[in-house]
């Protein structure tokens, strides 16, 4: 299923991890993303309750999930978990999900936080911002989600 988004669509992005999920928010009109929060990944119930609250608050039109891969592009153990998380987001919240190769997003996030003197404990949310910004930067003028 493909859904065209309005030019001012709001997006939520996720950097999925076993212990924490970084979340960022962005907008198609401004093509900018910002780190939002870190959701503790305690268990499935807590994870989706917290994400549901974010979706209710920000009312995104679509979601973006970082896809972890080895440097050579091969999948690894977290790849399947992130895919499952994104598919569950789509199933639970009926929002289109797009995937972004997240290789080096955490490295870029740490470097950006250090350069700005920000707290290192925000790295997961900053990684989600990097993922979403990469997604926004790669969009043509008119984008359709799958």
From Swiss-Prot:
* Name of protein: Putative pre-16S rRNA nuclease
MF terms in GO: nuclease activity
Origin species, per record, is: Burkholderia thailandensis (strain ATCC 700388 / DSM 13276 / CCUG 48851 / CIP 106301 / E264)
Q: Which Pfam family name is an example for this entry?
A: RuvX
Q: Which GO terms describe its biological process?
A: rRNA 5'-end processing
Specify the superkingdom.
Bacteria
Q: Quick check: keyword Nuclease in the entry?
A: yes
Please provide the record's keywords in A-Z order: Cytoplasm, Hydrolase, Nuclease, Ribosome biogenesis
The record's comment on protein family reads: Belongs to the YqgF nuclease family.
Role summary: Could be a nuclease involved in processing of the 5'-end of pre-16S rRNA.
What are its E.C. numbers? 3.1.-.-
Name the enzyme group at the top EC level: hydrolase
GO (cellular component) term, any one: cytosol
Q: Which cellular compartments is it found in?
A: Cytoplasm
| Signal peptide stretch | none
InterPro entries linked: RNaseH-like_sf, YqgF, YqgF/RNaseH-like_dom, YqgF/RNaseH-like_dom_sf
- SMART domains referenced in this protein's UniProt entry, alphabetically: YqgFc
